[in-house]
Amino acid sequence: MQNSKRRRWRLGAVFCVLVSILLACGVREHGPWTETFDEAGDWQVSADAAASVTVADGVLRIHVFELGQVAWAAAGRTYSDFRLTVEATQVSGPDDNEYGVLTRMAGDTQFYVFSISGDGYARIARYNNGSWSILGPDWVPSDVIHQGAAPNVLEVEARGGTFVFSVNGTQVLQVEDAQLTKGDIGLYAGAFNEANVVIDFDNLEVQPLQ
């Protein structure tokens, strides 16, 4: 695991640079949802010199070509309180990476980030109008995260200002934060000192909570 201050600085910098290139079009109110990525649907597939998002062979794949870059795709759906699960698999690339889920997104200005790394760390952060905040411990190690080229099941439960982040059925972080109340969801991946991070996402499920 690399120095957490370096990782945090890079996260803020690269999101500001690339945030607009891979957003899906439109935001709609939705209920329970299952996504198996048999087709692109509302997910915007796109590519530039830094990264690509594709939907093929039953997965959404994010390939980050350049070091120090992050890319995402948004679903174009609005949720407030919900439980989300998704299978995320590091296909190739360095373990010093990050990938995960974005929630309560308002375009490129506001969102929560639920992250794991290929070397076994987890974190929750918030981006709000140009300001980054780490919620809870910064890059906490967890033995439940499958390291390297392996699948992990990510689960995010958002209920009011309480967020629970679980990996492979075990809670790794719980935080309180009431700044963002609803918004879109997204999937993302990022590279740090080495390029060519490839992450596949599949079997996304979202269940609204009462």
Language-model regions: role of each:
Residues L22-A24:
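C-terminal motif of bacterial Sec signal peptides marking the signal peptidase cleavage site
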Residues A51-V70, A122-R123, Y188:
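Short carbohydrate-recognition loop motifs
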Residues F37, L84-V86, H146-F165:
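Short tryptophan-centered beta-strand motifs in secreted/extracellular beta-sheet-rich domains
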Residues F37, D202-V206:
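Extracellular beta-strand elements of beta-rich domains used
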Residues V175-D200:
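Flexible glycan-contacting loops in extracellular carbohydrate-active proteins
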